[in-house]
A protein has these predicted regions:
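N-terminal low-structure segments adjacent to metalloprotease catalytic domains
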Residues: 1-113, 367-396
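Charged, low-complexity, helix/coiled-coil-prone segments
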Residues: 48, 68-91, 164, 186-195, ...
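A long, hydrophobic alpha-helical segment
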Residues: 3-6, 228-234, 246-247, 254
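Short low-complexity stretches enriched in small and charged residues
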Residues: 68-81, 118-124, 203-207, 228, ...
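Acidic/His/Gly-enriched intrinsically disordered linker/tail segments
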Residues: 187-204, 218, 238-396
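Short hydrophobic alpha-helical membrane-anchoring segments
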Residues: 10-19, 234, 254, 258, ...
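Juxtacatalytic substrate-recognition/specificity segment
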Residues: 108-240, 351-353
Length: 396
């Protein structure tokens, strides 16, 4: 009887091996596919599917059940290659000159495409890798700066793109035709998810069909301002306009030389920026008329845009820079803790108005906050005179 049972078991095993050999081999010879799942960590992680999935969508269904609700700030689609610092840096510099790859040079179509590690540049004229390498330092260094600041902005290309996109126009007429605001040296289009820059803003000019470097262009502040908007593309719809513009103004105000940002002298750079916007020199200090904090906090996008052709624009940009600088370097323990907490709260879905109440004002009324701000700036040689315009006031 035992012998008969053993023979029966052997027969069953042989039948299984005959019927299912391919299925076993196929699972053994391939890696399990992966499904992207969002977690509270903004870096997209890959969850391997179990190889014995019996239904085509079972792994996807499992990941959907395990994944938390989507964040308000869309997490990057790919892991960031540079992590934010814990403390504010005094200097941020590229390790070397960016490597440039020629993607295509179509003379008939008038389309020339070049790439550096984090950007793709489409041009309407053949610039060549040496010229691209010259201005790419500003792009790549601004990416590095926004990655490293303790704000942890996690810059990432727009959805469905692996690289940030830049459109370089060879002349000012082509730049204007692309929709450039009058007098602009560059702009970021949220609709196209692309930065538009005239070659003249990059220290490049075309002479008789030849591309030449223009040594008279010494400042990259407008370009860096607009690149910073691109670095914050995921945040733009969710943050108050004073903060998105203030962050871009801060980056543009920093001393930038040959791929290197110097942040250790930002107080001096701030005063220089304010003087450029009309501040009066008072001995070793500067005096500037800043929009009252309550009105600044209440400014929305349409109101900001409506003031772009008026004297309010100058005051708006300078006031946004001053408030952002204060939150980065002077508020409370001077460690940007309130700003960082505000960003993390918005990242998790809290409306920015409430995040400002909870982490920026942090129990202070706008007038009290303003008083503290004035004292802190006076300590570094910036005298603020807060002015009213009669606009809406933020409700604490």
């Amino acid at each position: 009887l035992i012998l008969l049972v053993l023979l029966a078991l052997v027969g069953v095993v042989l039948w299984i091996m005959r019927e299912f050999p391919r299925r076993e081999v196929s699972f053994a010879q391939r890696e399990a596919p992966a499904v992207a799942a969002r977690s509270l960590d903004p870096v997209t992680k890959a969850l391997p599917l179990v190889a014995v999935t019996t239904r085509p969508n079972e792994g996807m269904d499992m990941a959907a059940k395990l994944a938390p609700l989507p964040l308000q700030v869309e997490p990057p689609q790919q892991a960031q290659d540079i992590q934010a610092l814990k403390e504010w840096p005094r200097e941020v510099a590229l390790a070397g000159t960016p490597e440039v790859t020629i993607v295509s040079q179509d003379t008939q179509a008038g389309e020339f495409i070049y790439r550096t590690p984090h950007f793709e540049y489409s041009c309407d004229a053949p610039l060549g890798p040496d010229v691209v390498r010259h201005f790419a330092r500003a792009f790549e260094a601004t990416y590095l700066l926004n990655c490293l600041l303790p704000l942890d902005l996690k810059p990432a290309p727009e959805p469905l793109r692996k690289l940030f996109q830049a459109r370089i126009l060879s002349n000012d007429a082509a730049f204007a035709a692309a929709g450039a605001p009058p007098g602009s040296g560059g702009f970021y289009s949220r609709g196209d998810k692309r930065i538009y820059v005239p070659a003249s803003s990059l220290g490049v000019k075309l002479v008789g069909g030849r591309v030449m470097l223009d040594q008279s262009v010494e400042s990259n502040d407008t370009l860096i301002h607009e690149i910073t908007h691109q670095m914050m593309s995921r945040w733009l719809p969710l943050l108050p306009v004073w903060l998105t513009e203030g962050a871009a103004e801060y980056a543009g105000a920093a001393d930038f030389v040959h791929g290197r940002f110097f942040l250790g002298q930002m107080q001096d750079r701030l005063k220089q920026r304010l003087r450029g916007r009309g501040a009066r020199q008072m001995g070793t200090s500067v005096r500037f008329a800043m929009l009252k904090v309550g009105e600044l906090l209440a400014l929305d996008g349409p109101t900001w845009a409506a003031g772009m052709t008026t004297a309010a624009a100058n005051e708006n940009y300078a006031s946004a820079l001053l408030l952002t600088f204060y939150l980065y370097h002077l508020d409370r323990a001077a460690d940007a803790a309130g700003m960082i907490a505000c960003l993390r709260a918005v990242e998790q879905g809290l409306p920015h108005e409430q995040a400002v109440r909870d982490f920026i004002l942090a129990g202070r009324r706008p007038d009290d906050f303003e008083r503290e701000m004035g004292l802190a700036f006076a300590g570094i040689g910036v005298e603020l005179q807060f002015t009213r315009r009669g606009g809406e006031v933020f409700k604490p």
